């Protein structure tokens, strides 16, 4: 597993992330290559091609979106828009048809309106993530959000929104996983669940 906060931003001299995937996949004895967590705005066509072409690269991707609202993404300083995220997911799914896609979603971030939240719900319904890590926002000292933005969404509302998206994702995950019923696939057991 290649691990980094923005792992796909890797560059060293003339080597980019796609080259790194190819180099790791070429190592004798390597049968499975995974990586986490890529940054949406740094995903290149070369990286998508490497994922699609290399049988060692698992067709699974954790691609954090955080919110379905452009205004929230801007407040979070994410550096990409929802339309850019949608476009990236479309390109990934076109290149890797059985891609398993997971994400991170935060509700109750500073200034999140009801419409911002509804945009997140609609994005989840559209993207149909296989799974998602979902959180309610809480202040972290030392961050730009803590220094510059008021934590103005009431805690009860954060919890209500979190419960709603968890229920939605559980339903989506159940539906998405139905595609595997009755199929035999190769798996790697990593330990007891």
Predicted regions and their residues:
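Conserved SAM/AdoMet-binding glycine-rich loop
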Residues: 1-114, 125
């Amino acid at each position: 597993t290649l691990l980094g906060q923005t792992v796909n931003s890797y560059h060293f001299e003339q080597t980019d992330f796609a080259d790194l995937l190819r180099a790791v996949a070429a190592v004798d004895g390597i049968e499975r290559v995974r990586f986490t967590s890529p940054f949406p705005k740094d995903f290149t066509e070369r990286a998508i091609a490497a994922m699609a072409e290399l049988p060692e690269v698992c067709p699974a991707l954790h691609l954090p979106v955080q919110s379905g609202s452009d205004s929230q993404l801007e407040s979070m300083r994410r550096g990409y828009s929802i339309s850019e995220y949608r476009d990236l997911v479309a390109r990934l799914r076109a290149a890797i048809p059985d891609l398993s896609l997971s994400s991170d979603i935060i509700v109750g971030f500073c200034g999140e309106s009801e419409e911002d939240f509804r945009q997140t719900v609609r994005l989840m319904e559209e993207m149909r993530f296989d799974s998602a890590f979902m959180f309610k926002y809480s202040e972290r000292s030392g961050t730009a959000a803590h220094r510059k933005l008021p934590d103005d969404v009431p805690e009860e509302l954060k919890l209500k929104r979190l419960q709603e998206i968890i229920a939605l994702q559980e339903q989506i995950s159940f539906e998405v996983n139905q595609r595997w019923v009755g199929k035999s696939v190769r798996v790697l057991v990593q330990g007891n669940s």
